[in-house]
Amino acid sequence: MKTITFFKRVLASAALVSVCGFACATNNGKQFIHNDTMEGGKLVCREIYAMNDAASGILNPVKMYKYSYDTDQQKTVKSTYAWNIFKNTWETESRTVISRYETETSVEYSVWNKEKGSFDLSKKYIYITDNNNQLIAQYAYK
């Protein structure tokens, strides 16, 4: 019985290693480079570029993240943009809004709706902690 359990673990480990190998191989040799914009010691914008061919040195925009902070210097909004190669412009993709109250933190994830021109709330998570910042309850809404 112990031998069967051992072989199951070995098989699961081998499967995990091969999945990781396939995931690494899917980038097709692309290198990703990021450009960070800092203000007051805080990251406010990160642009991600792909370098398909290191010899040419040509960078292609992929994603951009913009961050907002509250007066306590805690992150409140993360906006995600994707590069549209046909329009040569950044297009809104999603937004994450973090709201903090005394012992409650709310995280709302919204996806951009092109037809409406606004965000559609996709997921909402609420985390409740005690005075020692230990998690008491977690709620998820879709």
What does each model-identified segment do?
Residues M1-Q31:
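Bacterial Sec-dependent N-terminal signal peptides
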